[in-house]
């Protein structure tokens, strides 16, 4: 089941249930070419500018360590596919220690897939996160939308929006989306 909600805020994402787990899908068209966007999502120095500190082996099969300062999230992952400049697939392991020093959920595995498509001088990016606990899917939707917006700000040289204010603005709409997939 898929749900998309209208609202006063632009909602880039949708939520659905698949095999009893949540799926977050965020889609946005960026004002840059595919090679620049690919570099922004795969180059550790550029990732740090909008998303997270990522260390490790960023080739297929490589183990990575991810630290998202804004969310106080830390975890590990593995690069499953890296098909420049079109597709990146990473698996992550969430544990009770991943979030805010043990305040998280029981361990689970998730996949994050980014697909890029050139559209003239622009690029369409779709991020799909699978394996999220249904009780947390709204929060992941908000988080990934904020990450997509932060990427846009980074690429255009604008200042990022206040994450806490943005979170509070987006959460009701994503909670409505989550309730609809129930």
Predicted regions and their residues:
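Short beta-edge strand/loop motif at the mouth of beta-sheet-based domains
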Residues: 23-26, 32, 36, 44-78, ...
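A structural signal for short hydrophobic beta-strand segments in well-ordered beta-sheet cores
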Residues: 15, 79, 114-116
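A conserved amphipathic terminal alpha-helix motif
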Residues: 1-5, 131-182
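Amphipathic alpha-helical segments that line or abut small-molecule/effector binding pockets
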Residues: 35-38, 149
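A detector for short, charged/polar N-terminal pre-domain segments
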Residues: 9-17
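Short solvent-exposed loop/turn micro-motifs enriched in small/polar/acidic residues
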Residues: 8, 21, 49, 72, ...
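Residues at helix-coil transition
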Residues: 42-43, 84, 153-156
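Beta-strand/loop substructures that line and gate deep hydrophobic ligand-binding cavities in soluble
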Residues: 19, 23, 91-155
